[in-house]
């Protein structure tokens, strides 16, 4: 089958006034194709016809599939047997649908089952869609014709006095100008493929039908979020409820097993996976699985070494933005998580969770070697290394090894002499933020660690631990040579 040479679709530097009846564009396309290729098949030879009743039964997706197939056929035909006469005389309803697609640049969605024909009272042209007629009427109403701008956002017209070889058509969204309408039709199809769902009121295009559905609320029965600081226009009631839930903290979705609440269904669905143990996102490097794609993406950065989130205070980089946020608090001193029992504040929620166990006395992680219990699993893992003698973290400067990476990081600062944490009261500098916090208590007199037996208070938790051994009689340090415990 012969194909159409569309190399004539060149761009022009000068703006073009694109207003004229679409019938002239149709005539030019037909004449050009008919004169260029005499022995090719016609549009009617490849067209698939539906009766009005059959067409009404198609949903929006099926109509767009029909459009895509017929447009592809149209672009590959050497001639098109479209008679330039009012569309009301045509027997094929689909051809009217397709022609409006090509020559108006507007994608149509039918909200009714019947096929209603609308005619222009000024020139008599007939349209198969009311909004196509509205778009056409703007040409009669003098829509900015002297300035060379398109009326609407996705409207295609041709110049009144144009002929083949001149600048004919301009598509407003991208500003490209073509010398012949078929070239513009191909260009339109490329752009429309990216945003196939068009608003019939303003012509705005959307990639997804749901986005168009939300947008239509601006023109019709929009529901404004009741919170003034939000000022969002939300159409579906479910979206409005979800927006309100964000402001009020109300969580309407609940799990049946534990009763935990969420603001929307997607959060609920993700949470249910934690109960089922589903981990459908697998790392191709190490085989580790994760519950969601975001966790997998964070994990992949461990293999790549990419740390895109950098601290503006010290230059330290992190793989996740949440890690950077928590780190910045070590510089700013912000501690948003406060213990309701003793008032101690923490920069991270995990720190507060661990601290709360000190009040409850809960230590769920127990060492199988010696029976010692810990509040966190990481503390248990680090403790087990005492029994195994494992010290996997080595200092590159002196070769000294450590049980944990945090201890190695602290040790490295002894080589660099860095003391980034400075007391604002006396100017004394410290290697670690924890030591600065302890030092600050010498100025404030704060002693948050209290002995439950005698009520004596301490500024440091380690001093409280030593003091408690007086009451318990515990002597954990044993001299192996003399068999003496201290």
Curated annotation (Swiss-Prot):
One of its GO terms (molecular function) is zinc ion binding. A zinc finger (C2H2-type) spans 118-140, 169-191, 197-219, 223-247, 253-275, 281-303, 309-331, 337-359, 365-387, 393-415, 421-443, 449-471. There is a cross-link at residues 273, 424 (Glycyl lysine isopeptide (Lys-Gly) (interchain with G-Cter in SUMO2)). Keywords: Isopeptide bond, Metal-binding, Nucleus, Repeat, Transcription, Transcription regulation, Ubl conjugation, Zinc, Zinc-finger. Pfam families: KRAB (PF01352), zf-C2H2 (PF00096). Residues 41-127 form the KRAB domain. It comes from the Eukaryota. GO terms for cellular component: nucleus. GO terms for biological process: regulation of DNA-templated transcription. InterPro entries: KRAB, KRAB_dom_sf, Zinc_finger, Znf_C2H2_sf, Znf_C2H2_type. Gene3D superfamilies: 6.10.140.140, Classic Zinc Finger. It is found in: Nucleus. May be involved in transcriptional regulation. PANTHER family: PR DOMAIN ZINC FINGER PROTEIN, ZINC FINGER PROTEIN 833-RELATED. Belongs to the krueppel C2H2-type zinc-finger protein family. This is Zinc finger protein 561. It comes from Macaca fascicularis. The gene is ZNF561.
């Amino acid at each position: 089958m012969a194909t159409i040479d569309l190399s004539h679709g060149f761009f022009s530097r000068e703006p073009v006034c694109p207003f004229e009846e679409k019938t002239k564009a149709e005539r030019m396309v037909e004449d050009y194709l008919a004169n260029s290729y005499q022995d090719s098949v016609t549009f009617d030879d490849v067209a698939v016809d539906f009766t009005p009743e059959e067409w009404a039964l198609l949903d929006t997706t099926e109509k767009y599939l029909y459009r895509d197939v017929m447009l592809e056929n149209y672009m590959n035909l050497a001639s098109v047997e479209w008679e330039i006469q009012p569309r009301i005389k045509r027997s094929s309803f689909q051809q009217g649908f397709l022609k409006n697609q090509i020559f108006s640049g507007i994608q149509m969605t039918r909200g009714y089952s019947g096929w209603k024909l609308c005619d222009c009272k000024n020139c008599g042209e007939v349209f198969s869609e009311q909004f196509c007629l509205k778009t056409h009427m703007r040409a009669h109403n003098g829509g900015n014709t002297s300035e060379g701008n398109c009326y609407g956002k996705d409207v295609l017209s041709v110049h009144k006095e144009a002929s083949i070889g001149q600048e004919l058509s301009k598509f407003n969204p991208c500003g490209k100008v073509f010398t012949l309408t078929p070239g513009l039709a191909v260009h339109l199809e490329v752009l429309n493929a990216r945003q196939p769902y068009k608003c019939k009121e303003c012509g705005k295009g959307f990639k997804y039908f749901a986005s168009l559905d939300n947008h239509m609320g601006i023109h019709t029965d929009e529901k404004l979020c009741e919170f003034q600081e939000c000022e969002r226009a939300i159409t579906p009631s479910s979206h409005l409820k979800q927006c309100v839930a964000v402001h009020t903290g109300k969580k309407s979705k609940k799990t049946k097993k534990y009763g935990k609440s969420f603001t929307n269904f997607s959060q609920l669905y993700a949470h249910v996976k934690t109960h089922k143990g589903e981990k459908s996102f697998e790392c191709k490097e190490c085989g580790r699985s994760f519950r969601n794609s975001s966790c997998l993406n964070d994990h992949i950065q461990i293999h790549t070494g990419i740390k895109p989130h950098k601290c503006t205070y010290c230059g330290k980089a992190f793989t996740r933005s949440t890690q950077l946020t928590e780190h910045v608090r070590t510089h700013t001193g912000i501690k948003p998580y406060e213990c309701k029992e003793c008032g101690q504040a923490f920069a991270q929620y995990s720190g507060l969770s661990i601290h709360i166990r000190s009040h409850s006395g809960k230590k769920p992680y127990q060492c199988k070697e010696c029976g010692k219990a810990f509040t966190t699993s990481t503390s248990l893992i680090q403790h087990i290394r005492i029994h195994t003698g494992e010290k996997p973290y080595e200092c590159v400067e002196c070769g000294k090894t450590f049980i944990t990476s945090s201890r190695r990081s602290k040790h490295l600062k002894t080589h660099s002499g860095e003391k980034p944490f400075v007391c604002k009261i006396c100017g004394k500098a410290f290697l670690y933020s924890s030591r600065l916090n302890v030092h600050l208590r010498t100025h404030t007199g704060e002693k948050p660690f209290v002995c439950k037996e005698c009520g004596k208070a301490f500024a440091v938790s380690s001093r409280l631990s030593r003091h408690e051994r007086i009451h318990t009689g515990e002597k954990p340090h044993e001299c192996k040579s003399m068999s003496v415990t201290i």
